């Protein structure tokens, strides 16, 4: 809310006391836009490289300029690169492992035999038909203040001084590790019914304020007519 203070003195010109701090409202402005990182419902998919995070983690993504971005959107694909395969986002950006390196496989790897445990550790089914750890883990990072992340579009965020530096799960022993579920995606945490109710309440408040302004204008007009 924007206000203008029109009374700053405690007495009038004749020395009589009067209340201070009288303000006139001038309207409203946007103070901040915040992002809610509440856990969304997990939806099962048929995508072999779809992932959903249960917990506070963010997937780590390498952007075209070499910087690291963070996202909760785990809709990934296995893309073909010059020497083999690379786990990538839908936009073609590389998904990073827990060491901050792109997750790649050479051309001899049968990527249909890959599997993943609940911590994002990547396994490859061997000749014995059993999964074996590859030593690579899908990277997940947490932040002391996720609300301080900078939104850069397409569900991507960048770390800022307000968010703090990324804390890598599996390296920072003080963190509670997130669960990374394969063949699931996280749905929006927005409750459509609640948002509709809030919108109706806001609309009603706007209508009431509009009517109050109209009534005030009519009263002033009547006062002007009485003077004339």
What does each model-identified segment do?
Residues 1-228:
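Amphipathic alpha-helical polymerization modules
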